[in-house]
Amino acid sequence: MSIRFMLNETSYFGRGAREELAGELKKRNFKKVFLVSDKALVSAGVAAKVEEVLNKIGIPYDLYDEIKPNPTIKNVTDGVEACKASGADVIVTVGGGSSMDTAKAISIVMTNPDRADIKSLNGLSNTKNRAMPVIALPTTAGTASEVTINYVITDEDAEVKMVCVDPNDIPILAIVDSELMASMPKGLAAATGMDALTHAVEGYITAAHNEMSDMFHMKAIKLIFKNLAAAVNEKEPYAVEQIGLAQYIAGMGFSNVGLGIVHSMAHQLGAVYDTPHGIANAMLLPTVMRFNGENPETAQRFREILCEIGRPDAAHLNDQDVINTFVWMISELSKAVGITTTIKDYGAKEEDFEMLAEKAMNDPCKPGNPREVTKEQFVELYRKAM
């Protein structure tokens, strides 16, 4: 049986890597840039670091920054119109998952005008044409949208996060520059770091995992447990760089094998209560891992992880002790970076659980979970996460 892996054409990684953008734009003979970011990054001067690179080589660009933290259909449709008006031939996106996901959605519609109804992109999109070229420079260390075939857009009317999966949307270039991540506020660094951990853990235990994805996910897990607290609490440059690497290689893995029900549940919290995605994952991860660990094969995967992150004694523990230890280590890391909230703190109400569970049942991440889950079990998992 063959293994298919889809990645960027080219990737750059390291402090100051954004300078590579100039050479790539010249080499590919692009004439004008449509720059996609968000207002916070523009105000903080982060987007300006990339604008400096563009100005050095004299390439014209138009800036689009009308993007919400949970980007909406309107953010995309307005962006498409702005991109058309600009006459650009390449999109450069600077930001976290919000900016990158919006840029990817815009790029798909630009070359697939028959899919201008953004709702038609939900799930497996099956678009006909390769997206308009996108070069992605992440400013957060979590979503890995710069290397994935996924993007998430919120349908505000239906209160649903649309997980759009399309091999045509992967950016041609990913430039992971930890200097662009250094300005992240502590809370955002913690949230995106726990998002990256969720990607790596869910990717490692997902039903479709393989030897290649295992390699990426295990390395990401080790890097995150070792470096996240220092990256968040001390902004230690090497730790920030290592978390940037961890989130990227986790994305290399999960984009090709899928995720699980932590994401199925987190998407609904974001759509209904506007809960930040990384925080939602952090709050749900321990509860869901305890549930998934009841599958003996998954408990063994937890055992393998523990042996690699400083608990070699896990090789001799029974499954229940393995589950308890792994869940405890996740919870302790979350506390260490300042995430101590529950879904109740973000507005979750028990009377909403049936509705949330129904939506989670239809989420595209659900099929990847290593254990089957019913609507009733989703309700109970939300209840336990309170």
Language model: regions and residue ranges:
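Glycine/threonine-rich beta-strand-loop-alpha-helix active-site module
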Residues: 74-179
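N-terminal small/polar loop signature for handling phosphorylated ligands or for N-terminal nucleophile
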Residues: 42-115, 229-240
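An N-terminal, well-structured beta->alpha segment
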Residues: 1-64, 385
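Short glycine/serine/threonine-rich phosphate/pyrophosphate-binding segments
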Residues: 18-21, 43-46, 73-76, 98-103, ...
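Gly/Pro-rich interdomain helix-loop hinge
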Residues: 272-352
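Carboxylate- and glycine-rich phosphate/diphosphate-binding segment that chelates Mg2+/Mn2+
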Residues: 150-257
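Short, amphipathic C-terminal "tail helix"
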Residues: 349-386
